[in-house]
UniProtKB/Swiss-Prot annotation:
Monomer. Homodimer; disulfide-linked. Heterodimer; disulfide-linked with MMP9. The keyword Hydrolase does not apply. A carboxymycobactin binds at residues 72-74, 145, 154, 158. Keywords: Apoptosis, Cytoplasmic vesicle, Disulfide bond, Glycoprotein, Immunity, Innate immunity, Ion transport, Iron, Iron transport, Pyrrolidone carboxylic acid, Secreted, Signal, Transport. This is Neutrophil gelatinase-associated lipocalin. Iron-trafficking protein involved in multiple processes such as apoptosis, innate immunity and renal development. Binds iron through association with 2,3-dihydroxybenzoic acid (2,3-DHBA), a siderophore that shares structural similarities with bacterial enterobactin, and delivers or removes iron from the cell, depending on the context. Iron-bound form (holo-24p3) is internalized following binding to the SLC22A17 (24p3R) receptor, leading to release of iron and subsequent increase of intracellular iron concentration. Residues 1-20 form the signal peptide. Enterobactin binds at residues 126, 154. Detected in the ureteric bud in embryonic kidney (at protein level). GO terms for cellular component: cytoplasmic vesicle lumen; extracellular region; extracellular space. The lineage of its organism: Eukaryota, Metazoa, Chordata, Craniata, Vertebrata. It comes from the Eukaryota. Belongs to the calycin superfamily. Lipocalin family. The modification Pyrrolidone carboxylic acid is found at residue 21.
Length: 198
């Protein structure tokens, strides 16, 4: 009996391992950055400040695993060199988690790369592009990274407040689908009052 249980455990381990590999091997290809919309006449000063993450879509997002996605906030703080210090504040367990990084301006206004990228040895490239914003209510930001030779991309729907209109959410879904994403790759966050307002 002990040998049978061991064989069953090994088979299950192999199945789980192959499923985990399949989830990253079947990534929807990232669109070329040049084909992603870029906010015309991007204003760095107006974009800074706090944004709440209302929606998230990406080739590594799976609705069935992330259906109870908790809202977090991201603060863009403009620096003298036109880079942003970017702080994301997330709820983790009973505490708050802070993720701080720098977005350095790229060749076109509204495009950025991850500063100090050598501090992230698993990341080969990381690009950020503001696709659409009115600065006062919403923004749609495209992120693309190459990590361990796999290309991931996501689109974030930001709101200056925790709630956005159904029309803006539908616009976000249409934008995500125009990049090749499916309904299963799109989630909306559950608002929280913990951590993210401070």
């Amino acid at each position: 009996m002990g040998l049978g249980v061991l064989c069953l455990a090994l088979v299950l381990l192999g199945v789980l391992q192959s499923q985990a590999q399949d989830s990253t091997q079947n990534l929807i290809p990232a669109p070329p950055l040049i084909s992603v919309p870029l906010q015309p006449g991007f204003w760095t000063e107006r974009f800074q400040g706090r944004w709440f993450v209302v929606g998230l879509a990406g080739n590594a997002v799976q609705k069935e695993r992330q259906s109870r996605f908790t809202m977090y906030s991201t603060i863009y703080e403009l620096q003298e060199d036109n880079s942003y210090n970017v702080t994301s504040i997330l709820v983790r367990g009973q505490g708050c988690r802070y993720w701080i990084r720098t977005f350095v301006p790229s060749s076109r206004p509204g495009q950025f790369t991850l500063g100090n990228i050598h501090s992230y040895p698993q990341i080969q490239s990381y690009d950020v592009q503001v696709a659409d914003t009115d600065y006062d209510q919403f923004a749609m930001v495209f992120f693309q990274k190459t990590s361990e030779n796999k290309q991931y991309f996501k689109v974030t729907l930001y709101g200056r407040t925790k709630g956005l209109s159904d029309e803006l959410k539908e616009r976000f879904v249409s934008f995500a689908k125009s990049l090749g994403l499916k309904d299963n790759n799109i989630v909306f966050s559950v608002p929280t009052d913990q951590c993210i307002d401070n």
